[in-house]
């Protein structure tokens, strides 16, 4: 999909306008403390542009999932407002409501260059202890109500770009002027370049737990790539399809035939592990390496040294690299070697001029936690959204934005 025709922030007038901005502040919080503020910082180009251009800014974001009254007590955006204030060095008025007089009054008295952060949009998923999902099912009245609070809507939340929620599609469909923010614009540009206009050789590295999560990506990318490297939990279903024994490694029994089909149509392209780092239990213990077959009682938890070498050789040839999903249980120190080595090899190839993109989710957090934050061309902020883009699917949150 190409979204080049969508209005961007620079196409619209924001001076003295009340601008509703959907950001993605869905950050990890432990005991009231934000442990990773990358998503907050990612929204700064848009927020700073709006401040410089005299906008009145109203920020909307979700935080986690809300399924009960108890969740609401634990998942307020209050700590995010505090952190945002510290990072911007500017007052952020937090309104602990998602609708009502207090919110309306605060917005109507907002001055240029002032910022309001509205409470977690997903609080609208539970009302009076009833699960109603007004936000996540895009309740039409809620979308209209939020849209009525502003004059302009900017969607800068790539993390929910594939969802039709009241706070993105709902507002965009009910407001006169809408545009995408700088983060979303950059995400779309980078993904389009990687998936639709790749310099050859083009390789994709797919990992993560399940084949079923990556079917759409495999089907969209297999005709385009020169090589498809398969690692992580999903690789054991492919190894089983090749007739290997996989011990008690992760297996999707009902996807073996599909894996066989992919191996047949992509026989010159698909690269699977040749050895595996295993353990007898799912624990951070010293690994045992098996080549070829994995014996009974053993669980494959990472790529083995020969597989890592094989992957590195392919990465060294590439001019475009897309990576989605870790190649091992990187949360265990003893089984992080595959994912870390892939990170290192991609980082080196980026320095050699390759265009490299890491899909969001686990591979992005692995890369960032391992110290590779600035070593790739782009690390996506949206796991599900980048995956759906790679599948060639429409991103509903972007489609709802006005064309130029």
From Swiss-Prot:
Substrate binds at residues 24-26, 39, 62-65, 122, 163. GO terms for biological process: gluconeogenesis; glycolytic process. It is found in: Cytoplasm. It is an enzyme of class 2 (transferase). GO terms for molecular function: ADP binding; ATP binding; phosphoglycerate kinase activity. Pathway: Carbohydrate degradation; glycolysis; pyruvate from D-glyceraldehyde 3-phosphate: step 2/5. CDD domains: Phosphoglycerate_kinase. One of its GO terms (cellular component) is cytosol. This is Phosphoglycerate kinase. It catalyses: (2R)-3-phosphoglycerate + ATP = (2R)-3-phospho-glyceroyl phosphate + ADP. ATP binds at residues 214, 300, 331, 360-363. It comes from Mycoplasma mycoides subsp. mycoides SC (strain CCUG 32753 / NCTC 10114 / PG1). Signal peptide: none annotated. InterPro entries: Phosphoglycerate_kinase (IPR001576), Phosphoglycerate_kinase_CS (IPR015911), Phosphoglycerate_kinase_N (IPR015824), Phosphoglycerate_kinase_sf (IPR036043). Monomer.
